[in-house]
Amino acid sequence: MRVALVHDWLTGTRGGEAVLAEIASFFPGAPIFTLFRKDGAVGAGLASHPIHTSALQRVTLGGRLYRPLLPLMPQAVAGFRLDGFDLIVSSSHCVAKGVIPPPGAVHVCYCHTPMRYAWDQRDDYLRQVTPLLRPLLRAELEHMRTWDVVSSARVDHFVANSRLVARRIERYWRREAEVIPPPVDVDFFTPGGERGGHVLMVAALVPYKRVEVGIAVAREVGLPLHVIGEGPMRRALRRGAPATVHFLGRVTREKLRDEFRSAALLLVPNVEDFGMVTVEALACGTPVVGLEGSGTADVVVSGEHGRLAPEGSVAALVAACREVLGREFPQGALRTRAEGFSRQRFRRRFGYLLERVLPARTSP
């Protein structure tokens, strides 16, 4: 059976790439089709797979400039030639699910979320451009919505990373999705060391992560805030932050683990699609404060593994943080919860899905 893997783009090693690497391990040597890649951004789990990029690779400056090319991405992903492949597995948060499978092939899409730019974060995307260009961009995003719905018919089986994303898939595309949470390396993220007295955020410095809300919450709680992550808002956030906020930028896995181990709590003030960092924190024995109705709620049982605030205001999040800080959360219980999202469990569930959806085939 010939298998092709499709991923939106390879410009970092975040949660989506971890999922892709785990899926790729089912199919050693299977080619990966991606719109563009950034040098040095392909992790060890994907290094043995041939990687094919689209024509956009030549105009993204090595994967550094790509968001303005959003209108060109549907055509680029549809241009991948997949003739002769029997199984297509796409890992999609933007356009990868819009690849055109050959006749007779089975297309399984692991959906991290439907395209943010066209749906739940459209208004945020519009605010990032000048008012003069907004009418043009709004019209283009409406076109992208139409394409997004139409191209969903190219998928035979959807897998969602959380109940929240499954609801979006049903609402936007009128399709059902099986929920299989992403794999987390709970063997690496383990408890250790002394618990410290700071709040931790692990997030890209972009508007929808609401880092400015996290800064306000930590100030009200009276604890230092450590922020791990990079992004275009770094300068603005640093300019308005008090001295008790420490921007650590991009860190090694070992440093990330140390931060989880020493934090008083992990704060997730935004609506996460799933949030692998939530599981990583619990695996290290650290409670989590997040939001009800978010993907975080698939991981955190409020009162057992932290607290889920009923809404995302500073006041509600401060109250949740104070409750968590005022009680003990046994590390064993947090660790046990995290182990339910292990790489091994993902492999069992995703492997079982493949067994169910693939027709019986004789080996070539």
Segments from the language model and where they lie:
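A charged, aromatic-enriched C-terminal amphipathic alpha-helix characteristic of glycosyltransferases
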Residues: 312, 326-357
